[in-house]
């Protein structure tokens, strides 16, 4: 079965795994999913990224983070913003602040995929891929 939106698929797999309190989740590897996973790791939403398999069957294995003795997921919500049917672009001044700065917007810029904070620091805008908080 062909996957027409790998970013939405990635977000859904992470969301489902964290709701079920799984330690890890597997997602098909691509340059975009690797970049998004690195941003999630830098922002503290996932603890570890590893690769499994080879060639076209390579998968990313993401170790999810939980907090407290009740193991509450670090990721409360993930929302896809720019979709294949409706792309959303913002300039530097128009970059959103998620939950007043508590969450992260992941932006695809000309300098690579980065968080909204990094994009503001670099002075670049781009496509708003998703919100994570």
From Swiss-Prot:
Gene Ontology CC terms: ribonucleoprotein complex; ribosome
Keyword annotations from UniProtKB, A to Z: Ribonucleoprotein, Ribosomal protein, RNA-binding, rRNA-binding
Gene Ontology annotations of biological process type: translation
Underlying gene: rpsH
GO molecular function, a single term: structural constituent of ribosome
Pfam families per UniProt: Ribosomal_S8
PROSITE patterns: RIBOSOMAL_S8
Entry function: One of the primary rRNA binding proteins, it binds directly to 16S rRNA central domain where it helps coordinate assembly of the platform of the 30S subunit.
Subunit organization: Part of the 30S ribosomal subunit. Contacts proteins S5 and S12.
Protein name as it appears in the record: Small ribosomal subunit protein uS8
Family statement: Belongs to the universal ribosomal protein uS8 family.
